[in-house]
Structures are given as structure tokens and as C-alpha cells.
């Protein structure tokens, strides 16, 4: 059976019937009119207004909501401001309006009260700033695009905010090896555009790519949508330049694919969330840009069918399978309710997004078509749509990428980023719906099925200590029973630092604390984050 391509919609909608439809219906065409903007425009962090509703109440200060005590750091004085002005003239920000954005996380769940924002442009300037802060015992909050989900990128109290926003230069790119060297403040989407013009892609893709910085991505060991194909940043990052707490510049900015000399120091800083040093430059290997990308968006009757569809795709698509995402019906409902996006397929209990990327358009499309025919005819899939045109591919991805934005409009969001055995991935969502009942507006699950990553979200009208108590530590204990991880890709930040023990043994936690004490004896780098306080 041959799937005929149609103009501008590279593959037809297919229905749960004996034969494929050769063209998409007028109904489907009308539904897809919203799919006209670039994928980046729909990034929840490219459009800050989505999460900062005009007239919304001020975010509660973090110490008022969470039981945390300020450590005995110094406070910023006029002399400190003068010293900073000498280091970075004209880039010391004390204006309250400008500071407001940097003191609040984009989810509007935590807020610090820093009185100064520093915007260095070079590693040497970062070094001088940290040297001064170390001498004065001033706590420092490194900040990239402020797109984190766990409160790791904003101050808890009055820490000095050290922004990498002006450290946004590409240092070098090699068009044979695909190795990119750049400053830490480069925005991921801009880097993606830069390397795509040279026929490469970034190994990392996130819904927040319009705002997040590559340095922050590395500092949090971000996973994202291409993890299934290209793996984690621990494998694609070749080298780092890092400024330590006392101002020492550690230059491990190698561009070598192989270097087996001594300890691999960069790995300490990948995922350290700015607690061991400030990443100022990154060397990363970029894969060649695929010649052909196909995306299918499918409706499945149950989670068992989602798993079986994944197994079929993984077995038959092999190396060209680059993403396998899932979302439940409530996710689709919220995307429609709050963002007015239309479901392009028949309503289903679950939805799956399958992406392939390879070097042969005809071969890849044929392989995907054959797989889709198989899952449709076997009843694993109720309905679906497929695209090979780049614009339409971006349109289908918007359904998945904008879930976070839709949730942020539904009220206060309790967010959990969990690694679980794939076969148990959705059980916790079902369990919590029963456990929470009407106390929660919505309990939804979506994420990267290909790597066992569940994004569990619970929405409520407002923050509730009672609801939080029903969720925690229950969610973490449940995850630990499955030998899962309490943080798959978002990091621990401020909100999850005290639950590290659910995923790591005491010996490992103690060793991490000792490493922190060795590299940052005064504890000035991103305090109150990532690690529980030492006893």
C-alpha cells in the first residue's frame, strides 16, 4: 500500500479505516490553520507574557513560603557596588523594575530580593567579580535564561545575581567535525540557527529554546526532545571553561573527541547547577543536519497501546527514530482550552508524537508509513496525521511543546520531573487522581517516553500547603519504590534539594557535599540549592 503525498501537506491524514485517505479533509485543513507560526514563537519562554499575566498578584517571597533560613553571608554595600562598577562599567543594575524579572522564576513560584544584577561579558570579568565576592563573603546566584523549573536560577534571599546574558558570542565552529565553541550566554535557539546555516544541528532541543542559555543547559544537564537520538550533554559536551568560587579560571575547553588524560573534570560541572563553578564557555559536538524529518501525531486508545506502539517504532524504525513523546487527554484539553490550539486527530485517551530524521526522504517516509499502517491496522492507533514538510513538522511539535505554557495558565502548578521504568510511567498519574480527588484541578502526565521521563503536573487554583502535603513526600517515595529518579532532567534546584536521598544513597550525598566544600569552602555559589544542608 502506497501513501500518496499531497501538496504542502507532505502526507495525508490517515483514519482508522481499511485504506488511507489520499488527501486531508476540509475539516482537518480548517483545524490546522493555527499551525502558521514558527515553532519558536510558541516556545513558552519566548513569550514571557504568557506566564506573567497583567495584574496578577505579586509572587510570595521564597522564605515566606518555604522553611529556609538565610546563611551568614555579607550584604551588598555601596563599596561593593563601586567595586563592581570598576570591573564592569555601566553593567551594574540596581533598578528595582529590572531586578524584579530576575528575582522571580518564570513559573512565578519563588521570589528572591536581590538588590544587584551584574552583566559581565568575559570570563575575566566573571573571575574578578567572584574574586571580590569570595573575599567579601557575598553569595552569588548565577543566572542564564531563567527558564528553570525548580527554582535554581533565582535568588532565595539577597544573593548577587550574576547574569551570562551578555556572554553570547560564538568563539569558533569547525564545519568538518561539527564542533562548536561558544560563550555560556548564547541562546539555544540562536545557536541552532547558526549551526543549521552550516548544515548541522544542536544535539539538544527544548521547548524553552527561545530563552534558555547553553551554559544553563549544561549546568542543569538538560535532556530535552532529542535525547532519544543524541543522548545527554554528558556525551556531547567536549569541554568547559569554568570560573571557580575564588575567581580561579579553569580552562578545560578542549575540542578533542578523545582525551584520556587524568580525571574528566568537566563532568563535575555538568549538572552541578552553578554550585561548583560558573560555566563561562562550552565546547560541544553538533550532529549533521538530517536531510529528511518526518513527524506523525497519533491517537491511542490506552497507555498499553502507547507502549506497544513505541516498541513497534523502536524495532522497525531503528536508527532514524529521533523522538517519541506522549501526552494524555487532559494535556490536549488544556492546550485547547488555554491556547486555543485544535486537536488535529480524533479525540483519544493518549497521544503520541513520533519523529524520524535521516538522510533519505523517500526511504524514511516509506519506513514510517509502513509502521503507521501496521499500528493502525492492529488497533494500537485510533487516528493520526503525518507531515514531512518542515513548517508542518513544527506545527505538530507545537502541540507537545506548549503543554507547559498551557499548564501555567491553569493556576498554580506542582511540577515533578521523574525517571521511571517505561512500563510504570503512567501508573503514578492514575494513582494521584484517586488520591487527590477534587483538591486538584488537573493531574496530567506527558513526557519523553523514549527515555522513561514523566512530566507529572498537578494544577490548583492557588498554592496549597494541604495539597503539597498530599503530594510530598508521597510522589518521591513512590518513585523510589520503582528505583526511579526524582529528577530526570530539570535538576534539583531549590525546590528538590531535600529529596536527593530518595535517589542517591547517603554515602553518595556525603561525597557530593564534600566536593562542594572543597571547591567552594565558603559556600557562596548558588547557596540553598541542589544539595541538602550538611548536618
Curated annotation (Swiss-Prot):
GO terms for cellular component: mitochondrion. (R)-2-hydroxyglutarate binds at residues 400, 404, 415, 457, 490. Zn(2+) binds at residues 448, 455, 489. Its EC number is 1.1.99.39. (R)-lactate binds at residues 400, 490. Pfam families: FAD-oxidase_C, FAD_binding_4. It is an enzyme of class 1 (oxidoreductase). GO terms for biological process: lactate metabolic process; malate metabolic process; response to cobalt ion; response to manganese ion; response to zinc ion; tartrate metabolic process. Activated by zinc, cobalt and manganese ions. Inhibited by EDTA. (R)-malate binds at residues 400, 404, 415, 490. It catalyses: (R)-2-hydroxyglutarate + A = 2-oxoglutarate + AH2; (R)-malate + A = oxaloacetate + AH2. GO terms for molecular function: (R)-2-hydroxyglutarate dehydrogenase activity; FAD binding; zinc ion binding. Keywords: FAD, Flavoprotein, Metal-binding, Mitochondrion, Oxidoreductase, Transit peptide, Zinc. It comes from the Eukaryota. PROSITE patterns: FAD_PCMH. Catalyzes the oxidation of D-2-hydroxyglutarate (D-2-HG) to alpha-ketoglutarate. Also catalyzes the oxidation of other D-2-hydroxyacids, such as D-malate (D-MAL) and D-lactate (D-LAC). Exhibits high activities towards D-2-HG and D-MAL but a very weak activity towards D-LAC. Belongs to the FAD-binding oxidoreductase/transferase type 4 family. This is D-2-hydroxyglutarate dehydrogenase, mitochondrial.
